[in-house]
Amino acid sequence: GLYAPSALVLTMGHGNSAATVNPERAVTLNCAPTASGTHPAALQACAELRGAGGDFDALTVRGDVACTKQFDPVVVTVDGVWQGKRVSYERTFANECVKNSYGMTVFTF
């Protein structure tokens, strides 16, 4: 094909680490050749990831979101392929509001 594959599965669950968390939600995100998948904002999430060069750690917290300090950790995992390179990513957030405040749409599922 003319494009490198970008197909990801993102999961979210409550707990401290992916090793011990049961995924409560899972969505798919395909970004090539066009944006698709069960991610609720696939088009925007693909554009956001392209802007970040596929680097999930580059998705930083937005200043316009106020979250409580409540500690109810959630773990997000991302596995699959981004522009032909294997991806395996895990990040723990203090609570779901904090998770949703990183980046714009990638983690909001």
Curated annotation (Swiss-Prot):
The lineage of its organism: Bacteria, Bacillati, Actinomycetota, Actinomycetes, Kitasatosporales. The keyword Acetylation does not apply. The record marks K69, Q70 as: Reactive bond. It comes from the Bacteria. The keyword Disulfide bond applies. Pfam families: SSI (PF00720). GO terms for molecular function: serine-type endopeptidase inhibitor activity. Belongs to the protease inhibitor I16 (SSI) family. Inhibits plasmin, trypsin, subtilisin, and other microbial alkaline proteases. Disulfide bonds join C31-C46, C67-C97. One of its GO terms (cellular component) is extracellular region. It is found in: Secreted. Keywords: Disulfide bond, Protease inhibitor, Secreted, Serine protease inhibitor. This is Plasminostreptin. Homodimer.
